[in-house]
Protein backbone atom coordinates (compact mmCIF):
# COMPACT_ATOMS: atom_id res chain seq x y z
CA UNK A 1 0.00 0.00 0.00
CA UNK A 2 1.46 3.36 -1.06
CA UNK A 3 0.78 6.01 1.58
CA UNK A 4 1.62 9.08 -0.51
CA UNK A 5 1.07 8.71 -4.26
CA UNK A 6 2.56 12.08 -5.13
CA UNK A 7 5.77 11.41 -3.22
CA UNK A 8 5.96 7.90 -4.68
CA UNK A 9 5.70 9.19 -8.25
CA UNK A 10 8.14 12.03 -7.60
CA UNK A 11 10.66 9.48 -6.35
CA UNK A 12 10.12 7.27 -9.40
CA UNK A 13 10.58 10.25 -11.68
CA UNK A 14 13.71 11.52 -9.96
CA UNK A 15 15.30 8.08 -9.97
CA UNK A 16 14.46 7.54 -13.63
CA UNK A 17 15.85 10.92 -14.65
CA UNK A 18 19.06 10.30 -12.73
CA UNK A 19 19.41 6.85 -14.31
CA UNK A 20 18.87 8.32 -17.78
CA UNK A 21 22.04 10.41 -17.49
CA UNK A 22 24.16 7.29 -17.14
CA UNK A 23 22.33 5.47 -19.93
CA UNK A 24 22.89 8.36 -22.34
CA UNK A 25 26.65 7.80 -22.17
CA UNK A 26 26.66 4.06 -22.87
CA UNK A 27 28.51 2.82 -25.92
CA UNK A 28 26.95 0.44 -28.40
CA UNK A 29 29.08 -2.39 -27.01
CA UNK A 30 27.93 -1.70 -23.46
CA UNK A 31 24.29 -1.71 -24.55
CA UNK A 32 24.70 -5.05 -26.30
CA UNK A 33 26.24 -6.52 -23.15
CA UNK A 34 23.37 -5.14 -21.09
CA UNK A 35 20.69 -6.62 -23.33
CA UNK A 36 22.49 -9.97 -23.45
CA UNK A 37 22.54 -9.99 -19.65
CA UNK A 38 18.79 -9.30 -19.59
CA UNK A 39 18.13 -12.19 -21.97
CA UNK A 40 20.23 -14.49 -19.78
CA UNK A 41 18.46 -13.35 -16.62
CA UNK A 42 15.01 -13.92 -18.13
CA UNK A 43 16.07 -17.37 -19.29
CA UNK A 44 17.44 -18.29 -15.87
CA UNK A 45 14.26 -17.13 -14.16
CA UNK A 46 11.83 -18.47 -16.75
CA UNK A 47 10.15 -20.97 -14.42
CA UNK A 48 9.49 -18.32 -11.79
CA UNK A 49 8.15 -15.99 -14.49
CA UNK A 50 5.81 -18.65 -15.88
CA UNK A 51 4.60 -19.50 -12.38
CA UNK A 52 3.82 -15.84 -11.74
CA UNK A 53 1.93 -15.69 -15.02
CA UNK A 54 -0.13 -18.72 -14.06
CA UNK A 55 -1.26 -16.82 -10.96
CA UNK A 56 -2.47 -14.02 -13.23
CA UNK A 57 -4.24 -16.44 -15.58
CA UNK A 58 -5.94 -18.23 -12.68
CA UNK A 59 -7.11 -14.92 -11.23
CA UNK A 60 -8.38 -13.83 -14.64
CA UNK A 61 -10.47 -16.99 -15.02
CA UNK A 62 -11.79 -16.61 -11.49
CA UNK A 63 -12.80 -13.02 -12.25
CA UNK A 64 -14.60 -14.04 -15.43
CA UNK A 65 -12.33 -12.34 -17.97
CA UNK A 66 -12.97 -13.17 -21.61
CA UNK A 67 -10.91 -15.76 -23.46
CA UNK A 68 -9.61 -12.97 -25.69
CA UNK A 69 -8.27 -11.13 -22.63
CA UNK A 70 -6.81 -14.31 -21.15
CA UNK A 71 -5.01 -15.01 -24.42
CA UNK A 72 -3.51 -11.53 -24.25
CA UNK A 73 -2.12 -12.00 -20.76
CA UNK A 74 -0.95 -15.60 -21.22
CA UNK A 75 2.78 -16.31 -21.18
CA UNK A 76 3.55 -19.95 -21.93
CA UNK A 77 7.01 -21.42 -22.50
CA UNK A 78 6.92 -20.82 -26.26
CA UNK A 79 5.80 -17.21 -25.93
CA UNK A 80 8.42 -16.44 -23.28
CA UNK A 81 11.13 -17.94 -25.47
CA UNK A 82 9.85 -15.78 -28.31
CA UNK A 83 10.08 -12.68 -26.13
CA UNK A 84 13.66 -13.55 -25.18
CA UNK A 85 14.52 -14.29 -28.81
CA UNK A 86 13.28 -10.82 -29.73
CA UNK A 87 15.99 -9.39 -27.45
CA UNK A 88 18.62 -10.98 -29.68
CA UNK A 89 16.93 -9.33 -32.65
CA UNK A 90 17.16 -5.93 -30.96
CA UNK A 91 20.81 -6.52 -30.07
CA UNK A 92 21.56 -7.06 -33.75
CA UNK A 93 19.89 -3.80 -34.80
CA UNK A 94 21.95 -0.70 -35.48
CA UNK A 95 21.96 1.71 -32.56
CA UNK A 96 20.56 5.04 -33.81
CA UNK A 97 21.96 7.05 -30.89
CA UNK A 98 24.91 9.20 -31.90
CA UNK A 99 24.08 9.10 -35.60
CA UNK A 100 24.90 12.39 -37.31
CA UNK A 101 21.86 13.30 -39.36
CA UNK A 102 23.42 16.27 -41.11
CA UNK A 103 26.43 18.52 -40.86
CA UNK A 104 27.48 21.79 -42.42
CA UNK A 105 30.17 24.43 -42.09
CA UNK A 106 28.59 27.86 -41.83
CA UNK A 107 30.10 30.97 -43.38
CA UNK A 108 31.04 32.22 -39.92
CA UNK A 109 33.19 29.13 -39.35
CA UNK A 110 30.78 27.32 -37.03
CA UNK A 111 30.56 23.57 -37.67
CA UNK A 112 26.87 22.76 -37.13
CA UNK A 113 25.55 19.21 -36.92
CA UNK A 114 22.34 17.45 -35.94
CA UNK A 115 22.83 14.32 -33.84
CA UNK A 116 20.36 11.65 -32.72
CA UNK A 117 20.08 11.37 -28.92
CA UNK A 118 17.87 9.55 -26.37
CA UNK A 119 14.56 11.10 -25.35
CA UNK A 120 15.44 10.66 -21.67
CA UNK A 121 12.62 9.09 -19.63
CA UNK A 122 9.66 7.30 -21.17
CA UNK A 123 6.46 6.38 -19.37
CA UNK A 124 4.51 3.45 -20.78
CA UNK A 125 1.00 2.53 -19.66
CA UNK A 126 -0.26 -0.78 -20.96
CA UNK A 127 -2.93 -3.39 -20.42
CA UNK A 128 -2.83 -7.17 -20.23
CA UNK A 129 0.22 -8.08 -22.33
CA UNK A 130 3.19 -9.02 -20.09
CA UNK A 131 5.56 -9.25 -23.07
CA UNK A 132 5.32 -5.46 -23.31
CA UNK A 133 7.30 -5.22 -20.07
CA UNK A 134 10.30 -6.80 -21.77
CA UNK A 135 9.80 -5.25 -25.20
CA UNK A 136 9.63 -1.71 -23.85
CA UNK A 137 12.49 -2.11 -21.40
CA UNK A 138 14.80 -3.54 -24.06
CA UNK A 139 14.02 -0.89 -26.66
CA UNK A 140 14.34 1.89 -24.09
CA UNK A 141 17.72 0.66 -22.87
CA UNK A 142 19.00 0.10 -26.42
CA UNK A 143 18.33 3.78 -27.10
CA UNK A 144 19.73 5.03 -23.80
CA UNK A 145 16.38 5.82 -22.18
CA UNK A 146 15.10 5.10 -18.70
CA UNK A 147 11.53 3.83 -18.48
CA UNK A 148 8.66 3.83 -16.00
CA UNK A 149 6.21 0.99 -16.64
CA UNK A 150 2.62 0.77 -15.51
CA UNK A 151 1.00 -2.49 -16.58
CA UNK A 152 -2.53 -3.70 -16.00
CA UNK A 153 -3.58 -5.19 -12.68
CA UNK A 154 -4.39 -8.42 -14.54
CA UNK A 155 -0.68 -9.06 -15.15
CA UNK A 156 0.83 -7.60 -12.00
CA UNK A 157 2.48 -10.86 -10.88
CA UNK A 158 3.95 -11.46 -14.34
CA UNK A 159 5.21 -7.90 -14.68
CA UNK A 160 6.86 -7.93 -11.27
CA UNK A 161 8.69 -11.17 -12.07
CA UNK A 162 9.82 -9.88 -15.46
CA UNK A 163 10.91 -6.45 -14.21
CA UNK A 164 12.86 -7.91 -11.29
CA UNK A 165 14.78 -10.18 -13.67
CA UNK A 166 15.54 -7.16 -15.86
CA UNK A 167 16.60 -4.96 -12.93
CA UNK A 168 18.90 -7.67 -11.60
CA UNK A 169 20.67 -7.85 -14.97
CA UNK A 170 21.00 -4.05 -15.07
CA UNK A 171 22.61 -4.03 -11.64
CA UNK A 172 25.02 -6.79 -12.64
CA UNK A 173 26.22 -4.53 -15.45
CA UNK A 174 27.04 -1.77 -12.96
CA UNK A 175 24.12 0.46 -13.92
CA UNK A 176 21.25 1.94 -11.94
CA UNK A 177 18.46 -0.58 -11.40
CA UNK A 178 16.01 2.31 -11.63
CA UNK A 179 16.73 2.53 -15.33
CA UNK A 180 13.64 0.29 -15.44
CA UNK A 181 10.92 0.83 -12.85
CA UNK A 182 7.51 -0.78 -12.52
CA UNK A 183 4.58 0.84 -10.74
CA UNK A 184 3.49 -2.09 -8.58
CA UNK A 185 0.24 -0.68 -7.27
CA UNK A 186 -3.03 -1.14 -9.21
CA UNK A 187 -4.26 2.24 -7.91
CA UNK A 188 -5.65 4.04 -10.97
CA UNK A 189 -4.87 7.47 -9.55
CA UNK A 190 -1.20 6.67 -10.13
CA UNK A 191 -1.89 6.68 -13.87
CA UNK A 192 -3.25 10.22 -13.69
CA UNK A 193 -0.26 11.24 -11.60
CA UNK A 194 2.21 9.71 -14.04
CA UNK A 195 0.59 11.64 -16.89
CA UNK A 196 1.45 14.89 -15.11
CA UNK A 197 5.04 14.03 -14.20
CA UNK A 198 6.41 16.39 -16.85
CA UNK A 199 9.31 17.47 -14.64
CA UNK A 200 10.90 14.07 -15.21
CA UNK A 201 9.10 12.16 -17.98
CA UNK A 202 9.66 13.15 -21.62
CA UNK A 203 7.06 11.01 -23.42
CA UNK A 204 4.05 8.85 -22.56
CA UNK A 205 3.08 5.82 -24.62
CA UNK A 206 -0.31 4.28 -23.78
CA UNK A 207 -0.88 0.77 -25.08
CA UNK A 208 -4.49 -0.12 -24.48
CA UNK A 209 -8.10 0.45 -25.42
CA UNK A 210 -10.04 3.57 -26.26
CA UNK A 211 -10.69 4.51 -22.63
CA UNK A 212 -6.97 4.52 -21.81
CA UNK A 213 -6.13 6.47 -24.97
CA UNK A 214 -8.79 9.06 -24.14
CA UNK A 215 -7.63 9.36 -20.54
CA UNK A 216 -4.05 10.03 -21.64
CA UNK A 217 -5.08 12.53 -24.32
CA UNK A 218 -7.22 14.48 -21.85
CA UNK A 219 -5.03 14.44 -18.73
CA UNK A 220 -1.39 14.33 -19.85
CA UNK A 221 0.86 17.36 -19.54
CA UNK A 222 3.53 15.31 -21.32
CA UNK A 223 3.64 14.54 -25.07
CA UNK A 224 1.58 11.38 -25.68
CA UNK A 225 1.89 8.92 -28.55
CA UNK A 226 -1.61 7.63 -29.26
CA UNK A 227 -2.35 4.44 -31.14
CA UNK A 228 -2.76 0.72 -30.76
CA UNK A 229 -6.47 0.71 -31.55
CA UNK A 230 -6.84 -1.15 -34.83
CA UNK A 231 -10.08 -1.02 -36.76
CA UNK A 232 -8.52 -2.61 -39.84
CA UNK A 233 -10.02 -3.06 -43.31
CA UNK A 234 -9.36 -5.05 -46.46
CA UNK A 235 -11.08 -4.07 -49.71
CA UNK A 236 -11.56 -6.75 -52.38
CA UNK A 237 -11.52 -4.79 -55.63
CA UNK A 238 -13.35 -5.78 -58.82
CA UNK A 239 -10.01 -6.85 -60.31
CA UNK A 240 -8.98 -9.04 -57.36
CA UNK A 241 -8.05 -12.71 -57.55
CA UNK A 242 -10.83 -14.13 -55.38
CA UNK A 243 -9.09 -17.31 -54.20
CA UNK A 244 -5.87 -15.52 -53.26
CA UNK A 245 -7.82 -12.68 -51.65
CA UNK A 246 -9.69 -15.09 -49.39
CA UNK A 247 -6.36 -16.56 -48.25
CA UNK A 248 -5.18 -13.08 -47.27
CA UNK A 249 -8.47 -12.28 -45.52
CA UNK A 250 -8.35 -15.54 -43.58
CA UNK A 251 -4.80 -14.85 -42.45
CA UNK A 252 -5.65 -11.31 -41.38
CA UNK A 253 -8.70 -12.45 -39.42
CA UNK A 254 -7.88 -15.86 -37.99
CA UNK A 255 -4.13 -16.13 -37.39
CA UNK A 256 -4.32 -14.16 -34.14
CA UNK A 257 -7.65 -12.37 -33.79
CA UNK A 258 -6.95 -10.77 -30.41
CA UNK A 259 -4.32 -8.29 -31.63
CA UNK A 260 -4.69 -4.76 -32.98
CA UNK A 261 -3.54 -5.58 -36.53
CA UNK A 262 -6.17 -8.30 -36.98
CA UNK A 263 -8.81 -7.66 -39.62
CA UNK A 264 -12.15 -6.18 -38.54
CA UNK A 265 -14.05 -5.38 -41.76
CA UNK A 266 -14.00 -6.70 -45.32
CA UNK A 267 -15.30 -4.48 -48.12
CA UNK A 268 -16.20 -6.32 -51.34
CA UNK A 269 -16.89 -4.85 -54.75
CA UNK A 270 -20.47 -5.45 -55.83
CA UNK A 271 -19.42 -7.28 -59.00
CA UNK A 272 -17.66 -9.99 -56.92
CA UNK A 273 -20.13 -10.38 -54.07
CA UNK A 274 -22.22 -13.27 -55.45
CA UNK A 275 -19.11 -15.28 -56.27
CA UNK A 276 -16.72 -14.29 -53.48
CA UNK A 277 -18.97 -14.22 -50.43
CA UNK A 278 -20.01 -17.91 -50.52
CA UNK A 279 -16.33 -18.89 -50.70
CA UNK A 280 -15.45 -16.46 -47.93
CA UNK A 281 -18.25 -17.74 -45.69
CA UNK A 282 -17.21 -21.34 -46.29
CA UNK A 283 -13.56 -20.69 -45.46
CA UNK A 284 -14.04 -18.53 -42.37
CA UNK A 285 -17.08 -20.31 -40.91
CA UNK A 286 -15.03 -23.50 -40.80
CA UNK A 287 -12.51 -21.60 -38.67
CA UNK A 288 -15.11 -20.36 -36.19
CA UNK A 289 -15.65 -16.85 -37.54
CA UNK A 290 -19.05 -15.17 -37.09
CA UNK A 291 -20.25 -12.28 -39.24
CA UNK A 292 -22.00 -8.92 -39.23
CA UNK A 293 -23.08 -7.96 -42.74
CA UNK A 294 -24.90 -5.33 -44.77
CA UNK A 295 -28.30 -6.16 -46.29
CA UNK A 296 -26.77 -7.47 -49.52
CA UNK A 297 -24.34 -9.63 -47.57
CA UNK A 298 -27.18 -10.99 -45.44
CA UNK A 299 -29.24 -11.82 -48.53
CA UNK A 300 -26.40 -13.91 -49.94
CA UNK A 301 -25.88 -15.60 -46.58
CA UNK A 302 -29.60 -16.39 -46.37
CA UNK A 303 -29.45 -18.20 -49.72
CA UNK A 304 -26.71 -20.36 -48.24
CA UNK A 305 -28.68 -21.04 -45.08
CA UNK A 306 -26.14 -19.10 -43.02
CA UNK A 307 -27.49 -16.88 -40.26
CA UNK A 308 -25.45 -13.71 -39.76
CA UNK A 309 -26.04 -10.55 -37.75
CA UNK A 310 -26.98 -7.17 -39.19
CA UNK A 311 -24.12 -4.68 -39.39
CA UNK A 312 -24.69 -1.18 -37.99
CA UNK A 313 -22.69 2.02 -37.60
CA UNK A 314 -21.69 0.76 -34.18
CA UNK A 315 -20.44 -2.63 -35.39
CA UNK A 316 -18.50 -1.12 -38.31
CA UNK A 317 -16.70 1.04 -35.75
CA UNK A 318 -15.83 -1.96 -33.59
CA UNK A 319 -12.35 -3.35 -32.99
CA UNK A 320 -13.43 -6.96 -32.57
CA UNK A 321 -10.33 -8.60 -31.05
CA UNK A 322 -12.14 -11.90 -31.60
CA UNK A 323 -13.33 -14.25 -34.35
CA UNK A 324 -15.93 -11.77 -35.58
CA UNK A 325 -15.86 -10.00 -38.95
CA UNK A 326 -17.84 -7.15 -40.46
CA UNK A 327 -18.66 -7.33 -44.18
CA UNK A 328 -20.00 -4.67 -46.54
CA UNK A 329 -20.64 -4.80 -50.28
CA UNK A 330 -19.64 -1.53 -51.97
CA UNK A 331 -20.32 -0.06 -55.40
CA UNK A 332 -16.74 0.96 -56.20
CA UNK A 333 -13.31 1.74 -54.81
CA UNK A 334 -14.23 5.27 -53.76
CA UNK A 335 -17.16 3.99 -51.72
CA UNK A 336 -14.75 1.61 -50.01
CA UNK A 337 -12.33 4.46 -49.33
CA UNK A 338 -15.19 6.56 -47.95
CA UNK A 339 -16.15 3.76 -45.57
CA UNK A 340 -12.55 3.44 -44.38
CA UNK A 341 -12.28 7.20 -43.82
CA UNK A 342 -15.40 7.09 -41.68
CA UNK A 343 -14.67 4.07 -39.51
CA UNK A 344 -10.91 3.46 -39.55
CA UNK A 345 -8.71 4.18 -36.54
CA UNK A 346 -5.83 4.96 -38.91
CA UNK A 347 -3.95 1.74 -38.15
CA UNK A 348 -3.81 -0.67 -41.13
CA UNK A 349 -5.83 -1.04 -44.33
CA UNK A 350 -5.31 -2.97 -47.55
CA UNK A 351 -6.57 -3.43 -51.09
CA UNK A 352 -6.74 -6.78 -52.88
CA UNK A 353 -6.45 -6.18 -56.62
CA UNK A 354 -4.49 -6.91 -59.78
CA UNK A 355 -5.15 -3.39 -61.06
CA UNK A 356 -2.11 -1.17 -60.58
CA UNK A 357 -4.15 2.01 -61.02
CA UNK A 358 -6.63 0.94 -58.34
CA UNK A 359 -3.83 0.12 -55.91
CA UNK A 360 -2.12 3.48 -56.52
CA UNK A 361 -5.41 5.32 -55.97
CA UNK A 362 -6.03 3.40 -52.74
CA UNK A 363 -2.52 4.10 -51.42
CA UNK A 364 -2.86 7.81 -52.11
CA UNK A 365 -6.35 8.22 -50.68
CA UNK A 366 -6.30 6.01 -47.58
CA UNK A 367 -4.73 7.92 -44.69
CA UNK A 368 -3.55 5.20 -42.31
CA UNK A 369 -0.21 4.38 -40.71
CA UNK A 370 0.17 1.26 -42.89
CA UNK A 371 -1.47 0.66 -46.27
CA UNK A 372 -1.07 -2.69 -48.05
CA UNK A 373 -1.56 -3.99 -51.56
CA UNK A 374 -2.33 -7.72 -51.74
CA UNK A 375 -1.05 -8.39 -48.22
CA UNK A 376 -2.42 -9.09 -44.76
CA UNK A 377 -2.86 -6.35 -42.17
CA UNK A 378 -1.08 -8.69 -39.75
CA UNK A 379 2.26 -7.41 -41.06
CA UNK A 380 1.92 -4.15 -39.10
CA UNK A 381 4.35 -5.17 -36.41
CA UNK A 382 7.80 -4.00 -35.37
CA UNK A 383 9.33 -7.44 -35.78
CA UNK A 384 7.81 -7.93 -39.22
CA UNK A 385 9.00 -4.48 -40.29
CA UNK A 386 12.55 -5.28 -39.21
CA UNK A 387 12.40 -2.84 -36.29
CA UNK A 388 12.80 -5.47 -33.58
CA UNK A 389 10.29 -5.48 -30.73
CA UNK A 390 8.01 -2.47 -30.99
CA UNK A 391 7.03 0.11 -28.40
CA UNK A 392 3.60 0.65 -29.92
CA UNK A 393 1.82 1.25 -33.20
CA UNK A 394 1.23 4.98 -33.49
CA UNK A 395 -1.80 6.21 -35.41
CA UNK A 396 -0.61 9.81 -35.07
CA UNK A 397 1.31 11.75 -37.68
CA UNK A 398 3.73 13.72 -35.52
CA UNK A 399 7.00 12.29 -34.18
CA UNK A 400 6.17 8.66 -34.98
CA UNK A 401 3.67 6.79 -37.16
CA UNK A 402 3.05 3.06 -37.44
CA UNK A 403 5.20 0.52 -35.56
CA UNK A 404 7.57 2.41 -33.28
CA UNK A 405 11.06 0.98 -33.19
CA UNK A 406 14.36 2.37 -31.98
CA UNK A 407 14.40 5.68 -33.84
CA UNK A 408 10.99 6.58 -32.42
CA UNK A 409 12.57 6.58 -28.95
CA UNK A 410 15.11 9.21 -29.91
CA UNK A 411 15.14 12.89 -30.70
CA UNK A 412 17.99 15.07 -31.93
CA UNK A 413 20.09 17.95 -30.72
CA UNK A 414 21.99 20.61 -32.63
CA UNK A 415 25.72 20.75 -31.91
CA UNK A 416 27.81 23.76 -32.83
CA UNK A 417 31.62 23.48 -32.85
CA UNK A 418 33.48 26.76 -33.03
CA UNK A 419 36.89 28.34 -32.61
CA UNK A 420 35.73 30.67 -29.82
CA UNK A 421 33.32 31.89 -32.49
CA UNK A 422 31.08 34.89 -31.80
CA UNK A 423 28.07 36.12 -33.71
CA UNK A 424 28.71 39.24 -35.73
From Swiss-Prot:
It is found in: Cytoplasm. Keywords: Amino-acid biosynthesis, Cytoplasm, NADP, Oxidoreductase, Proline biosynthesis. GO terms for molecular function: glutamate-5-semialdehyde dehydrogenase activity; NADP binding. InterPro entries: Ald_DH/histidinol_DH (IPR016161), Ald_DH_C (IPR016163), Ald_DH_N (IPR016162), Aldehyde_DH_dom (IPR015590), G-glutamylP_reductase_CS (IPR020593), Glu-5-SA_DH (IPR012134), GPR_dom (IPR000965). GO terms for biological process: L-proline biosynthetic process. It is an enzyme of class 1 (oxidoreductase). It catalyses: L-glutamate 5-semialdehyde + phosphate + NADP(+) = L-glutamyl 5-phosphate + NADPH + H(+). Its EC number is 1.2.1.41. Belongs to the gamma-glutamyl phosphate reductase family. NCBIfam families: PRK00197.1, proA. This is Gamma-glutamyl phosphate reductase. It comes from Shewanella woodyi (strain ATCC 51908 / MS32). The lineage of its organism: Bacteria, Pseudomonadati, Pseudomonadota, Gammaproteobacteria, Alteromonadales. The gene is proA.
